[in-house]
């Protein structure tokens, strides 16, 4: 669908995958950003205070400090493998967050999403840079 806006300077592989990559990136971003608008509802569901849910989200956000180490590991993987690990991890984290019976598993789920989103984003960016010439 999006490939019709790309001219002939793009490789057929890029044109074939641009819609899938765009939809996947949109979905992973939605999984990553689903919590902030619903903090009060999530806190009420767990019967905890807003400050307690804030601690859970702080832990998730602090996991971003692992990004340099995650990036080094992702660089050793193939682009597709990094994207696959990221997608499986984000899906697992979202599922765990959705069905978690307590705040501890919820925190683990959103932290998984936060850490493994780096795998997908770096793998996808690397794949795009491999197939789109720099001008």
Question: What are these model-derived regions, one by one?
Answer:
Residues 1-13:
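Short, Lys/Arg-rich, polar N-terminal cytosolic tail immediately upstream
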Residues 12-58:
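Helix-loop boundary and gating motifs at the non-cytosolic
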Residues 45-46, 76, 127-132:
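Helix-to-coil boundary motifs at intracellular loop junctions of multi-pass secondary transporters
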Residues 60-62:
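Short hydrophobic/small-residue motifs within alpha-helical transmembrane segments
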Residues 109-135:
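Cytoplasmic helix-loop-helix junction between adjacent transmembrane helices
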């Amino acid at each position: 669908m999006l490939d019709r806006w790309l001219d002939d300077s793009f490789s057929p592989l890029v044109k074939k995958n641009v819609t899938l990559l765009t939809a996947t990136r949109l979905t992973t971003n939605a999984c990553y950003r689903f919590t902030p608008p619903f903090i009060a509802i999530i806190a009420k569901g767990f019967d905890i205070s807003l400050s307690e849910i804030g601690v859970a989200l702080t832990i998730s956000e602090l996991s971003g400090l692992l990004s340099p180490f995650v990036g080094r590991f992702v660089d050793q993987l193939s682009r597709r493998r990094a994207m696959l690990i990221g997608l499986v991890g984000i899906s697992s984290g979202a599922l765990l967050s959705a069905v978690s019976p307590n705040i501890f598993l919820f925190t683990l789920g959103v932290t998984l999403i936060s850490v493994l989103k780096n795998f997908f984003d770096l793998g996808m960016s690397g794949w795009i840079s491999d197939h789109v010439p720099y001008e």
